[in-house]
Design a protein with these regions (language model features):
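Short alpha-helical donor nucleotide-sugar binding micro-motif in glycosyltransferases
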Residues: 188, 304-305, 312-317
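Carbohydrate-associated surface elements
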Residues: 200, 223
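Conserved donor-binding/catalytic core segment of Leloir-type glycosyltransferases
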Residues: 235-253, 259-262, 275
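Nucleotide-activated donor-binding/catalytic signature segment of Leloir-type glycosyltransferases, i.e.
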Residues: 287-305
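A short, well-ordered alpha-helix in the C-terminal region of glycosyltransferases
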Residues: 298, 371, 378, 385-400, ...
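Aromatic "clamp/platform" in nucleotide-sugar-dependent glycosyltransferases that forms part
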Residues: 325
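Short hydrophobic beta-strand element within catalytic cores of glycosyltransferases
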Residues: 342-345
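Conserved acidic donor-binding segment of nucleotide-sugar-dependent glycosyltransferases
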Residues: 357-358, 362-369, 378-383
Length: 424
């Protein structure tokens, strides 16, 4: 935390925009917001969509939800009123921003339709920012919140706010590849600041963007607070190997690969059970797959778990499995390592920045259930290896993925942008 002599200036106010806030699978955004607030930054949270009430699980979630401005579902009077105010008080700016939105996307009419939706969402956020005196919008993820944040700032600039309105975004994992290279390069050029959570992500943005914009692309790891480094897991020396997977149940997370690996382990007589924590569109297909593989008695689908309880699940496990097909540096992997668990993870994108194979965990080729099963079997046959990996992984997270370190980097970067605005 910043000392009294290092207080942020009164201009250190900004909007934080995410698709959902709070979000069960993106609890790291909540941690980041609270860490920045503790460092004298005034953060106002905005979300494109309301959070599913079933995913508001803790008191912190409820507080975050109640204080967040949400666009959808729209409050009709406020939604229409924002557009009428923007159109009637600045028709040229409104139409120029709409034209900008419709002229830039790839994907033909389908892409333009999405940009129209983003424009419709951006105007109420601009109006709320105007009411609150906010002129900088930071988006988590390049799309869709990145598109909307860009349009919010664009509308502010078109209305005469050049030099005052600006925007920035954080790029994480697969979101880097959801935009076309030209679209993402344009976002990097338009933004005042770009935060990447991994060196891999930064390298990909540098590959797409012109060199004159590289300086604004910085790395600030997501991180964990000190509570995560207390009372770690104690892997057992015998009995069924208790495997844990945590995350959204979506195709890119690779849970189907993990189920195939469990089937292979069962065929080889390796005693292992799996708990899957999380929710998503693949829940029912994964349950059907488990039944078809004959491993339903070895797999438990727990559903969503709040941050106030998730640590109990890490502490009850012996090995953490992350079979993703693409990731930045997953926070669930940090949580597992901070809990002292040995991890088996896919060797893809930013993951090797956290997992050094054979040192802080085991890396396997993504999409290959045989490789995943072999790594798990190795840990089942050598529990002492798991304990060594768990200790080393825990040290890695403590030393390099501490929330305070990342928050200080973000604070410094935001203050540079905001002080530049104030000087104009």
């Amino acid at each position: 935390m910043s000392g009294d002599g290092d207080k942020a200036p009164k201009e250190a106010r900004l909007a934080y925009l995410a698709t959902l806030y709070p979000a069960l699978s993106h609890s790291f955004v909540q941690r980041e917001v609270e860490a920045l607030r503790a460092r004298d930054l005034e953060i106002h949270t905005f979300a494109l969509h309301a959070t599913d009430p079933a995913h508001v699980l803790t008191e912190a979630d409820r507080e975050a939800e109640s204080s967040t401005f949400t666009v959808l579902p729209p409050r009709l009077r406020g939604f229409v009123g924002a557009h009428l105010r923007a159109l009637l008080t600045g028709p040229a700016a409104y139409l120029r921003t709409l034209t900008f939105a419709l002229s830039r996307p790839p994907g033909g009419s389908h892409g333009r339709l999405w940009q129209l939706f983003y424009f419709l969402e951006a105007v109420p956020i601009w109006r709320e920012c105007e009411k609150r005196g906010l002129t900088h919008v930071h988006a988590h993820f390049t799309n869709p919140s990145g598109d909307v944040a860009q349009l919010v700032a664009r509308l502010g600039v078109e209305r005469g706010g050049a030099g005052r309105w600006s925007w920035s975004f954080s790029a994480h994992g697969t979101d880097i590849f959801n935009d076309g290279p030209a679209s993402l390069a344009a976002k990097v050029g338009s933004a005042s600041l770009v935060i990447c959570i991994s060196d891999f992500g930064r390298s990909q943005l540098m590959r797409m963007a012109p060199e004159e914009h590289w300086e604004k692309v910085r790395v600030a790891h997501c991180g964990l607070d000190g509570e995560w480094f207390e009372n770690g897991a104690v892997p057992r020396a015998e009995g069924d190997l208790r495997l844990l997977a945590v995350g959204r149940l979506e195709r890119e997370k690779g849970q189907s690969i993990l189920l195939e690996a469990i089937s292979l382990l069962q065929q080889r007589g390796v005693p292992a059970v799996l708990e899957v924590v999380g929710d998503g569109s693949r829940l029912d297909p994964l349950r059907r797959q488990a039944r078809a593989l004959g491993i339903s008695d070895r797999v438990t689908f727990t559903g969503p778990v709040g941050q106030d309880q998730i640590r109990d699940h890490y502490r009850a496990a012996d090995v953490f499995c992350l079979p993703s097909l693409g990731e930045g540096i997953p926070v669930v992997l940090m949580e597992a390592l901070a809990s002292g668990l040995p991890a088996v993870a896919s060797n893809t994108m930013g993951i090797p920045e956290l997992i050094e194979d054979g040192v802080t965990g085991l890396l396997v080729s993504p999409g290959r259930p045989g490789d995943l099963a072999a790594a798990i079997e190795r840990l089942a046959g050598d529990r002492s290896l798991g304990r060594r990996l768990g200790r080393a992984g825990r040290r890695k997270v403590i030393e390099e993925f501490d929330l305070d370190q990342g928050a200080e980097r973000l604070r410094s970067a935001f203050l540079q942008v905001l002080s530049g605005q104030a000087a104009r």
